[in-house]
Amino acid sequence: MSTSTARFRHQANRRTRRGRRLTVRTVITGITLATALACAERPHAQGVPGFLGTITDSQAVFSVPALPRPAYLTPVTEPTFGTRITRITGDAGSIISPTLGMWGNDARQVYSKQQPWNSTGTLLSVENRAGDASASPLILDGETYQPKYTPCSAFDNYEYRWHPSPDYPNVQIAVSRAGTELMWFDVANCRKLRTWTLPFPANYGIGSGEGNVSDDGRYAVISDGTRMVVVDMDPRGSAPAYPFKRIGPVYTFAPCSLQTGDAMFCPNGNISISPSGRYIDLKFGSGGVSCDTLCDMHRIFEVDSLLAIRPHRMADNSLRCGSFASRPDGWVFPLKHADMALDPFDNNEDVLLGGRACPGSSLGRVVKVRLRDGKVTALTDPSNEASYSHGSARNTQRPGWFYVTYAKASGSAGRRFSGEIVAVKLDGSGTVQRFGHYRSTAGSYRAQAHAVPSPDGRRVLFASDWAEGCGSDCGSPSVFSGYVIDARTGRDTIPPDTVQDLRKK
């Protein structure tokens, strides 16, 4: 069967399979004006323009009411926050379709820093692994979540990102398994559009698994354990256009003295070009040694017009941590599970966003660092705040917000945001938008939520085993599924039940 024929049959199967688009039951006639007004008057139910549900009260503490595990592709209302939740991956061992194989035990998004939706929100990529899984990743319809197709056989998609520009909605940017080729690949038409031979093998794809390309899809940084290089994938201005291959000089990591007695102890945890393409964030790994500040240390490099790389000097008085306090040669305040964004409240400066990781610091759990000079801004109030787990700034079409997955471990019980997915505003005001509880044990890595927003920030995809806060209908701690919280307006929904604020009076 030809690729085009197979793709057509996949489309035909999608149209006939389950025979419907998802709808949400209309219940307007059952809601009285008094009920609607009561919902509007509740402090926690204050709305955000353009959003359905979500809670803006940053001080409220909520328990997790029981919510049975949603059936596949059947939306339910989040009982506390009023958003909609849909499980978008099927039951383990069930048939996806006659041509697409079976669902595995581990079907979810990749990670909080990797965007699962394409630039237009019309396609969505999920992993499908373990158990009876047939193929991974799977491409779903980005709106209905119906499976569309499996990977093209010619696509060496070892490590990939969707192209962030709406001009390339079908294109993924990928590094081959061998780490020797960077490519643009049209996953809808199974066609390689652009290719670059890398000057050295990348040790693990784009940014050691956690990097992204610049917001316009032009720049990428590729690395191994000791080197990095910038690729201009879409040359403009005075540079010749593609297929001219514009690759910068290879930069070798300088001694960094992360470990006393070993100046070359500089393990590469992950690396990424900044949204503007002007900076590189190199996050160092612990290398298995005892952690203090070095476990979450970041060093910022600058990229010049010739794509040459050098450490970027920070302001001498910018806040740093521990023995790095007096080292402004690229070092910044340590952050865990950090992502980068352009800050609309600061002239679109590149900023690093993540969890506070300086021992003894009294800042809020969520912190912003400006890459130009290392300026530190706390974005949340630390009082009774749950621990930070992961964060995502993949909402590139809704700038000004950072989506945080808060921990639900025993140390966070009874705290604000415990077990929640929360958007935090970048202006330092402490403004939040609370989307929902993720109802997972988070007992293993793949059971962690790793919430990631859609490009427009109105939907959030998270992973869960749905084995806590589930009442009598729970999932299994060994089965991991993908769930979408949908906060878009324009669809009828049932308002959430009245919930109790458990904050300490």
Which role fits each region the language model picked out?
Residues S94-V110, P201-G207, F253-C266, F324-S326, ...:
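Short glycine-/Asp-/Thr-/Trp-enriched loop segments that recur within the blades
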